[in-house]
Regions:
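General marker for long, soluble alpha-helical cores
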Residues: 1-327
Length: 327
């Protein structure tokens, strides 16, 4: 009797009695109890047992120091009254369940506890960030095998210092238009493979795009190979000719469009500049200014370069010019 009762004791009684009550009309009378206390599992047993007659929507005060999120969700489903979890210092469970129980107003007493995730598959990066926003405690994600989401979402989650245990899992990016510099950031966060199969367009500076293809060649990134992106868009106003050559050598027959419309300046050796300005895949090139890096240069090759662009050619690095007087 009374307004509060131990669910631990009631659950123990239920277990002791076993199936005996299945043939009896009498039940354990807990109808006068307004608050049940005990572990989450024992409270759940009390609230769901057919042998216990309890009042509708009792209050619950849990005693767990580590509470299982999935069990807490089941307890919450049995009562609309207060569920107090103030004693818990750790919440464990799958990320989606943990995120649910940490939501403001779902239960009381949470918000500063540590979190231990038990997922062994993929977890959405947005869920990791959401969990971090709902507790000030540390979040152990060492069991997670894959982090998935947009590059922005993934990089945000990796950047949260309170999330530990990440660094060797796979990543699956969902961007259809993928920023190469953001891909580089993701690649730097994990030793696992970053899958970009969803991407149809890769864009960024020439150096960032070239680095993305290098990462693919090194098997740190997957999805930029034979069945990779359809379009490569080189952004920015200045590019090293060597990076553009790297991109040209990396794109496959499946890439239907290589764009560099924003480029106004090329840098690099004369031979690299001639090579890329002669490349038909870069249809937007031909009017850029070129700053060559050679110190020794044949005049004939300089003339060839000059014929490849309508822009000015700067040869201030050249200290020795060779060739015929006519050149």
């Amino acid at each position: 009797s009374g307004t509060s009762a131990s669910a631990d004791d009631i659950a123990s009684l239920v277990t002791t009695v076993g199936t005996a009550y299945s043939s009896l009309t009498d039940k354990i009378d807990a109808s006068g109890i307004s608050t049940f206390t005990g572990t989450a599992s024992n409270v759940l047993t009390t609230l769901t047992s057919a042998t216990v007659d309890e009042a509708a929507n009792p209050n619950v005060t849990l005693s767990d120091s580590t509470v299982d999120a999935a069990t807490l969700i089941l307890v919450r489903a049995e009562t609309s009254a207060t569920v107090d979890v103030s004693t818990a210092t750790t919440v464990s469970g799958e990320a989606s369940d943990v995120n649910t129980v940490l939501a403001v107003g779902y239960v009381t007493g949470l918000g500063t506890e540590a979190v231990t995730l038990t997922d062994t598959g993929a977890v959405a990066a947005t869920t990791l960030s959401s969990i971090a926003s709902r507790t000030t405690g540390t979040i152990n994600a060492s069991s997670v095998a894959t982090v998935e989401g947009t590059a922005d979402a993934v990089n945000t989650a990796y950047g949260i210092a309170r999330i530990s245990g990440l660094g060797n899992e796979a990543v699956t990016l969902s961007d259809t238009t993928l920023d190469a510099s953001k891909l580089a950031t993701t690649d730097g966060y994990t030793d696992g493979v970053v899958n970009v199969d969803a991407a149809t367009t890769l864009e960024g500076s020439a150096s960032a795009v070239a680095a993305a293809f290098d990462a693919n060649d090194a098997n740190r990134v997957s999805g930029l190979g034979a069945t990779g992106v359809d379009t490569v868009n080189v952004t920015g106003t200045t590019a090293a000719a060597a990076d553009l050559i790297n991109i040209e050598n990396s794109v496959t027959d499946g890439v239907t469009d290589v764009e560099a419309t924003s480029l106004t300046n090329l840098t690099g050796s004369t031979e690299d500049a001639i090579t890329i300005l002669s490349d038909t895949d870069f249809e937007d090139l031909g009017d850029e200014a070129v700053e060559i890096s050679d110190t020794t240069l044949g005049a004939a090759r300089l003339n060839v370069l000059d014929s490849k662009t309508d822009g000015a050619v700067s040869a201030t690095s050249v200290t020795t010019l060779t060739g015929d007087v006519s050149d």
